[in-house]
Amino acid sequence: MAGSREIRNKIKSVKNTQKITRAMEMVAASKMRRAQERMKKARPYGEKIRNVAAHMSRAYTEYRHPFLIERDTVKRIGIIVVTSDKGLCGGLNTNVLRMAVSKMKAWEAEGEQIEVCCIGNKGLGFMNRMGANVISHAVSLGDAPDLERLIGAIKILLDGYNQDRFDRVYLFYTRFINTMKQEPVMEQLLPLSDERLRASDRPTGQRGVWDYIYEPEAKPVIDDIMVRYVEALIYQALTENIASEQSARMVAMKAASDNAGNVINELTLIYNKSRQAAITKELSEIVGGAAAV
């Protein structure tokens, strides 16, 4: 009976854990829907500012912004790694960090220096443990991040590129595909590639040539637009990463709940067999005693 009591305690413990994982699954599902809405709402702004940046980069040929200039040699690289602040989201953080570390090792093998900006507690902790050169970070941003809290961290890299401290800047994050699929990606953030701007020179359905009147002059306007555009790219990546995080957490908690159910079934079967064996033994002892009398 001591064995049966121990099994009952295990069943009770697993059931309590299952209640927690089911609650976390429902919370993650609710947060996932809100994160997807924020992700969709951020896209129109990104598209509009990309249209403006694309046109201005072509229309005003007297000035070429540093973000558009390709460096002859690449010796110093800045990377932005976007992860979650919390765990229990499957392999989401592991996959993007594995990709980042793989690229970092390849660059270091070529003699390139790497400096890191971390967005998210998980990435910051990992990079600090591996001894990476972390120059800035933004953590505990919550499920609805404010761009203002990001600017301080990413401004260090943007200013560094302007000052020739970096030759390239890359962005690592998890792209949201659908509820069941998210994939880690690496994108070149700076210099801005033609692929990013090529399709955005003119809005769909609009004809004719754009022309702007700059007040007081074009250079400060272009400088500001380019910075805002890069910030929009990073913010869009962050919203996709949050949507991916909540989706991965919902799937992970559902899997945990299902596994808990399987464990409960197995323990219940073991308990029933143990109880049956104990009853059979008692009956055998009673029958044996009666026969002896």
Swiss-Prot record:
SUPFAM superfamilies: ATP synthase (F1-ATPase), gamma subunit. It is found in: Cell inner membrane. It comes from the Bacteria. Gene3D superfamilies: 3.40.1380.10, ATP synthase, gamma subunit, helix hairpin domain. GO terms for cellular component: plasma membrane; proton-transporting ATP synthase complex. PROSITE patterns: ATPASE_GAMMA. GO terms for molecular function: ATP binding; proton-transporting ATP synthase activity, rotational mechanism. InterPro entries: ATP_synth_F1_ATPase_gsu, ATP_synth_F1_gsu, ATP_synth_F1_gsu_CS. GO terms for biological process: proton motive force-driven plasma membrane ATP synthesis. Its main location: membrane. Keywords: ATP synthesis, Cell inner membrane, Cell membrane, CF(1), Hydrogen ion transport, Ion transport, Membrane, Transport. Pfam families: ATP-synt. It is a peripheral membrane protein. F-type ATPases have 2 components, CF(1) - the catalytic core - and CF(0) - the membrane proton channel. CF(1) has five subunits: alpha(3), beta(3), gamma(1), delta(1), epsilon(1). CF(0) has three main subunits: a, b and c. Produces ATP from ADP in the presence of a proton gradient across the membrane. The gamma chain is believed to be important in regulating ATPase activity and the flow of protons through the CF(0) complex. Belongs to the ATPase gamma chain family. NCBIfam families: ATPsyn_F1gamma, PRK05621.1-1. PANTHER family: ATP SYNTHASE GAMMA CHAIN, ATP SYNTHASE SUBUNIT GAMMA, MITOCHONDRIAL. This is ATP synthase gamma chain.
